[in-house]
Amino acid sequence: MNKEKRDAEMEEQSARMLEEEQQEEQRADKKIAVIVARQGEALPSEFLMSLRLMEQPAGFTMELVEVEGRAGLAAAYGQAMEASTAKYKIYIDERVRILDPGLFARIVRLFEKCADLGLVGISGTKILSPDGIAFHSTRRIGSLRLAEEARTVSWGRVLGEAEDVLAVDGFLMATQVDLPWREDLFHGAAFFDAAQCLEFRRRGLRSAVLGQEEPLVEFLGESFPADEAGRRAFLAEYATEALPLVSILMPTHERPEFFKLALESALAQTYRHIEIIVSDNSEDDRTEELMKAYAADERINYTHDAGLSAMQNWLQPLERARGEYFSYLFDDDLYAPEKIERMADVLSMEDGIAFVTSHRCAIDEEGNIVADLAIDPLPVEETSRIPGELAIYGLLEKQANFIGEYTTVLLPRSARETVREVLTEEPRSALLDVECWMRLLEHGDLLYIVDTLSYFRKHDGQSSNDPAVHIACARAWARLLRERAERESGMRRKKMFEQADLIEMMLRARGR
C-alpha cells in the first residue's frame, strides 16, 4: 500500500513539475528582455529615459537585464542571455536612444509571423566588403540618427516590412532564438554582431533590417574602432561563408621556376576566399613534383594532362571554376598581394561594371621592373570608372592594350561565356585579350585602378617576341578598326577607316 501511495505521489509531483514548466514556457513566450552591456558605473540617462517611454506589447512582460560590458560585448551578451528566460531578447548599445516607442511591438509582431527569422536590426549590410568591416560596404540598408553631428545617415531604403541582410549592426539586435555568442573569438566591441548573424545563418535562420521611413534610433556616441585581432578572427572563421568565392585560373607549361613564383603570389592574396585551379600540360613531370609540396592546401586544385593543347590548357581551369569572380594568372606573371581583395571589392559593391583592371608593371626574368611603352603612362590620373564605349575607343585609337592581359583583370562569372567564345573561335585572333575586352565593354563599364596590382614578365621564351606575332597583331588591329567603323558615322567612322588603311599600307610597304 505504501508503495502504491509513493508511486501516486511521484506521478502527481511529476505532473505538477510538467505543468510548471509549461507555464514557465508560456510566460517566457510572452516576455521581452532588454539587454544592455554597461561600460561605466551606470547606464546613460538618455538610454534609460527612452526605455521608459517604450510601449509594452499587450499581454507581454518586460525586463531590463544589465551586465558589465568592459570584458567584451560577446561575453556580456552571452552572460545576459543565460540569465534571462525571455523568448524575445533585444540587445541594445547603451549609447542608443530609441526614437520609436512602438519599436519592440513591431519586432515581436514580425517574429510571430516569421519562424525562420532569427535576428532583426535597424541597419545592416547585404554584402560584406572583403576586409570584413560591415561599414565599408556600399550595400548597406537602414538609417541612424547621429546626435553629435545632428544629422541622419541613410544607407539605403528598406523594402517592405523588413529586408534580409547578411549582417545587422550591433546598435540594436533582437532575437527570438538563443544561440551562443562567440566570446571565444571576439573580446571587444566589433565583429561580434556580424558573427552572430552568420551563426544564425549556419542554422538556417535569417537576419533582417526593419522597414523604416525615419531612423528608429539615435546614436549618442562614436563607433568603436574595428580591432585588427577581431578582424582577423572574423575572416578566419567566416570568410568562406561571408565573401564571394574568387577563382584564380593558372594554365602552365614547362616553366616550373616561374610557375612557383606565380603560385606563391596567388597564395599570398589578402582576400580570404579563393580557389586556385592549375592545369598543367607539361610533357615532363617537374611541375607535378613541385606541386607535391602544396598537396595539403585545400585551396589548390591541380591536374596534369600532357595531351592538352595550349588552348585546352587555358580552357580547363575556366570550365572547373566555381567562383563568383575569376582571374587568370599565367605561369610567368605575378599578382600583388592585395590584387584580388581590391578588385573583388569593386565588383561586389558597384553595379554596371563589366570588369575591373589595374596598372601593371613589366618585369624581367629576375623580377626587376623594366620600362614598357605599352604600359606607361597611365590612361587616367586616379582610379576611375570609364564608360565602356569610351574604353573601346581608347583601345582602338591608340592600338595599344592599356587594359592589360588576362592576368591583369578580374571578371564576373557572367563573363565566362564571352571568354570561352573568344578563346575557341576560328580563325583565332592574335589579340585574344583585346577582342574579349571590347565585347565585354559593350555591356558595362571598366573600373581602372591606378595602383600596380599585377606584374607582366618579359623573357626570351614568350611568343610575343616573334616578329610574326607582331604582324598578326597589326592585322588584327586593322580588322577591329574596320569592324567598329562599320557601326559608326561621321568623323569617327572616317578616322577609323583611315587608321585601318594606314596599318595595312605599312604592312604592304614592309612586304608583309
Where are these regions (language model features)?
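A conserved acidic beta->alpha catalytic loop
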Residues: 38-52, 56-58, 68-70, 97, ...
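Glycine-rich, basic loop-to-helix element that forms the pyrophosphate-binding segment
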Residues: 70-84, 305-321
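Short aromatic/hydrophobic "clamp" motif used to bind/position activated sugar donors
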Residues: 89, 326
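Flexible acidic/His/Gly-enriched loops in nucleotide-sugar-dependent glycosyltransferase catalytic domains
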Residues: 133-163, 307-315, 319, 341-421, ...
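Conserved nucleotide-sugar donor-binding catalytic segment
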Residues: 174-175, 179-188, 377-470
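Catalytic core of nucleotide-sugar-dependent glycosyltransferases
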Residues: 224-243, 380-389, 429, 452, ...
